[in-house]
Structures are given as structure tokens and as C-alpha cells.
Swiss-Prot record:
Carbamoyl phosphate binds at R55, T56, R106, H135, Q138, L268, P269. Pfam families: OTCace, OTCace_N. The keyword DNA repair does not apply. Pathway: Pyrimidine metabolism; UMP biosynthesis via de novo pathway; (S)-dihydroorotate from bicarbonate: step 2/3. This is Aspartate carbamoyltransferase catalytic subunit. Its EC number is 2.1.3.2. It comes from Escherichia fergusonii (strain ATCC 35469 / DSM 13698 / CCUG 18766 / IAM 14443 / JCM 21226 / LMG 7866 / NBRC 102419 / NCTC 12128 / CDC 0568-73). The gene is pyrB.
Amino acid sequence: MANPLYQKHIISINDLSRDELNLVLATAAKLKANPQPELLKHKVIASCFFEASTRTRLSFETSMHRLGASVVGFSDSANTSLGKKGETLADTISVISTYVDAIVMRHPQEGAARLATEFSGNVPVLNAGDGSNQHPTQTLLDLFTIQETQGRLDNLHIAMVGDLKYGRTVHSLTQALAKFDGNRFYFIAPDALAMPQYILDMLDEKGIAWSLHSSIEEVMAEVDILYMTRVQKERLDPSEYANVKAQFVLRASDLHNAKTNMKVLHPLPRVDEIATDVDKTPHAWYFQQAGNGIFARQALLALVLNRDLVL
């Protein structure tokens, strides 16, 4: 039977049902346990990064290579026809889609990835981040990591800390975890960077418990996952950035009453929000989390590009 993600655009985490999320995670686990270096041997994938990226771009391109795909693309739109000659995004995508089997795209403008789907024909577009909107593949690796460390994706207590306004990772992750049962959220952020109201309204509509807090200490003993984020300098004016960047910092001493299996996650890069002394604790799991990006992205590529995937 054809898998439901074959040739599907993946723009928002809301494009995936709970069953489809579980399919991606199960596929990721299989690929982690049993690599498939020729699964995409005859596929060509475009890696189109209109915005700076290190982890996401390298993770995606490594995933492509490890599945045997050929990779074309760019990491700096300033050197493309779009950047130098004023070509529209629509024309850029229309042309690239004639060359490749799938397009992985990051863009600073919210909605750009969805717009790209209107011009890619039958070529699926995978959103690698569009402005402060969505980052669905980061969410998949987050879910994979949570499932690996906690053994489940339901009945969890999850705290999210820092920039919850502009941090697209926390928007996507909250929406994804809301598809599972019994989860409870704690949001810890300065007023200027609070979780958007539409996310809180979504949780209310689903009857999911959440609360706002002013310090990590208030919730440390309760949580299974502590999801830290950096204050995004590139999305704030200098005076606002200076006021909030040091407001929430996690140190090893803050973990004294944490649950034994509580894990600290972070989408990276970090700045000062996690002290380096946390790295040596058993709670630190952000580097393993980043490594899981390979398997989550391999799984998504494999499913989107294979009608009948059997592993």
C-alpha cells in the first residue's frame, strides 16, 4: 500500500496527522538501526537555503547523501539570480522544480515555503524554516528525541523557555505534541517574547493544560522535558535584545531537583542561555538531539520520495 506521505508537501507540522507523525518516527528509528545508503540512489534533491543555516542545512544534506541521493543547491541567495538579478521566488522555484525530485527550502519570509508549493508542480517542497513561522523537520527530530528518551509522546510535562514569540521551533513542537494525549505545557518567557496567543487558543480549544511562569525554578521538579531557546538577536531591535537576552539562563546548579530522566533540549545554536557546566550533566541532551536530525530528515525524505517504502 502506498504510504500517505508520498510526494506530499511538508510545510507545517499541521500538514501531518498523528498517524503520519508516528509513521515518520517509526521510519526514523528503522533508519537509525539499519542504514540504507542506496535508498534514494537515483534521486536528485535541491537544497535551497535563502537564509543562513548551519545545523539544518548540513543535517539535511548529510541525510540526502547517506541515502544515496544527489544534491544540488545553494546556501546564500545573494549569489543566485533571485539575489543578484531580481528574479522572483516563483520563477526560481518554477525552474528548480524542472531539475529535481524534491526541494528542501529555508527562507526568511513567513509563508514563502507555502508559496513555493504553488510553483513546484508535482515536486514536493519540504520546509526547512520560513521566518518565525514553522520549522517542521526540527519538530520531527524533537519528537524523535523525546520519544527515545521518555519512551512516549503522551502524558508528558514540557517546559519551554526563552524566546517563545519568534522561536518557530516552539510553535511547531507545541502544535505537534498537542496531537498526543495528556500532555501539559509550562511557558517561561519575558512578556515581550511570550508564546503567541494563537498557540494558547489552540491549546484551550483542545482542552490541554498550560500555564505561564516567570522562572525555570518554579517548574523544574515537574517537567520531563525542558526545552530551552535562544533569544533571536536577528529578529529584535538592539535595545530589546539587550533587555531580555540574559533573563533566563540555565546552570547546572538549577538542576538539583530535576527528575532523574528529565532531558534538556535546545534547537541550537545556543548563546548564553545554557551554561557550559550543564553539558556534563546527564540531563543535557541537545547534542544527541541535533544528531537525531539526520534520522528524522532521512525518514521524511524516504517517505516523500518512495511510493511503497519497505524497510
